[in-house]
Amino acid sequence: MRRIRIYLAYDGGPFHGWQVQPGLATIQGILEEIVGGMEGKPVHVAGSGRTDAGVHALAQVAAFSIENPIPVENLRRAVNRLLPPAIRILCAEEVQADFHPRFDAVAKTYEYRMFRDEVCSPFEWPYVYHHPYPLDEARMATLARAFEGEHDFTPFAASDARDAEGKSKVRTIFSSTLDRTPQRLVYRVRGSGFLKHMVRNIVGTLIEAGRGNIADLNSLPARSGATAPAKGLFQVSVEY
């Protein structure tokens, strides 16, 4: 049995997230159907994280085990020929049998993109949160840095993840920055791991700070702002 690690990019817009859902098009489901068809039996494809519906990935990491002796580069080409155009395997490699893309990860980086100009191109709109309204971006950048360090992120988890018993909500954020480009605000965060909706809820909280609704910019608020739309979020990288 061979363990194969793949790095893939995808446009999350057409899909219902990463995780298999009966009757719905998901990244994991499509990969398992294709690889399982090549293997001649069901194959479980594990991912480094379960991106939500509409969230994009620049370099998601996944892994699966097969008996097929096909060289990894030929495997990459064969799977890409069968994948929809919105999903592409960037590279594939053989790894140790016990590798797990989620449990072996030591850090992940996400990026959230907000488009700030009044007119957003229709070719950019699917990949940004268009927010042309007034915001104090300096306040937002100050609060972004308060998320660095080890914290209990329970207020920033989705309600179903927030209520999960016995699961720690403590995460370590190594860096949390907000940068301005000519037309965009880009929030970039690198951490040990992330809860469901955590990055999008942090962005919603930064927006509340930009509106002047958060007084203390040097510590985490007791509650998050509204969850920012999924389409502005990108999984950038996973480190091992």
Curated annotation (Swiss-Prot):
Active site positions, chain numbering: D52 (nucleophile)
Binding-site list for substrate: Y110
Gene Ontology biological-process entries: tRNA pseudouridine synthesis
Disulfide bridge map: none
EC number(s) recorded for this UniProt protein: 5.4.99.12
Catalysis: reaction(s): uridine(38/39/40) in tRNA = pseudouridine(38/39/40) in tRNA
Zinc as UniProt keyword: no
Keyword tRNA processing recorded: yes
Keywords: Isomerase, tRNA processing
One Gene Ontology molecular-function label: RNA binding
CDD domains: PseudoU_synth_EcTruA (cd02570)
InterPro entries (alphabetical): PsdUridine_synth_cat_dom_sf, PsdUridine_synth_TruA, PsdUridine_synth_TruA_a/b_dom, PsdUridine_synth_TruA_C, TruA/RsuA/RluB/E/F_N
Subunit structure: Homodimer.
UniProt xrefs under HAMAP family: TruA
Function: Formation of pseudouridine at positions 38, 39 and 40 in the anticodon stem and loop of transfer RNAs.
Sequence similarity: Belongs to the tRNA pseudouridine synthase TruA family.
Descriptive protein name: tRNA pseudouridine synthase A
